UniProtKB/Swiss-Prot annotation:
The gene is tsaD. GO terms for molecular function: iron ion binding; N(6)-L-threonylcarbamoyladenine synthase activity. Coiled coil: none annotated. Keywords: Acyltransferase, Cytoplasm, Iron, Metal-binding, Transferase, tRNA processing. One of its GO terms (biological process) is tRNA threonylcarbamoyladenosine modification. This is tRNA N6-adenosine threonylcarbamoyltransferase. Gene3D superfamilies: 3.30.420.40. The keyword Ribonucleoprotein does not apply.
Amino acid sequence: MTDEPLVLGIETSCDETGVGVVRGRTLLANEIASSVDLHARFGGVVPEVASRAHLEALVPTMHRALEKAGLRLADVDAIAVTAGPGLAGTLLVGVAAAKAYALALGKPLFGVNHLAAHVAVDILEHGPLPRPCVALLVSGGHSSLLLVEDVTGTVRPLGSTVDDAAGEAFDKVARVLGLPFPGGPPIDRAAQEGDPQFVAFPRGKADDGTFDFSFAGLKTAVARWVEKRERDGEPVPVADVAAAFQEAVADVLTAKAVAACRTYGVGDLLIGGGVAANSRLRSLAAERCEAAGIRLRVPRPGLCTDNGAMVAALGACLIKAGRTPSEPEFPADSSLPITEVLV
């Protein structure tokens, strides 16, 4: 296979149906169908609803991606699919489809780690990954710090959330403030008009000497503060609360990420995951990395959220590294550890 393999990637770990096509490090197509509107009235992702949405959206999304890339499915060199972690039912939809296509076409199939794919996607924008680098991955389901020596096989977990992920906290605080689901974008927009110093919300595990995160206490503190204002008959300054909450999240995430770089003598920090689209997280990370002499890499927002291009990018990296394709009977694994980049 060539050094620039043509790879189709399938992503169904949560509520986005993603199909991407890459040629080596070149992005050819990245099509996404989101079921977020179906989950909005529940205030969170409903696994059964998400699984059914994937069943309906996967084939049309694949057709759009192939059309955008100007290819037929038979043209691809390999197929990559998210095998985990994620929601068990939604993962099964993507894995089953990928296996069927690979078998029918006689193509090699790579079952890959969702978190490692969030790291690998940066090659599509900024070129080969530095070795080593620290990766901060922040989404609705994950808040993790990783030491990435080689995204195709040597990834070491440094810390993770001990309770709520940052994205989950955004969703719950948005609900408290009467903002729509998912909470990240509306909180970011509201915060533009607010004062980040309006309330000094707590920073969980900020000074505990670990690289773990905790956002449950912050989420609860915001809810209690809002409840007290409402009991007292006072208006809730949504923009100020959003800005103060967002500042607390960005403060902890960036402080620990920079500390991890210093501790391990690493000069490059990569930030990925859906929350990486947050404007304050990006700006504060840039400020702190510049002050610490650390090079910062953050993909554009469209590559930070769950998508098929990131899966295809990791597949291309694995092929270039000479990794053997997955066995046909590999399972979807909702709790796949980051140490298993390829199943």
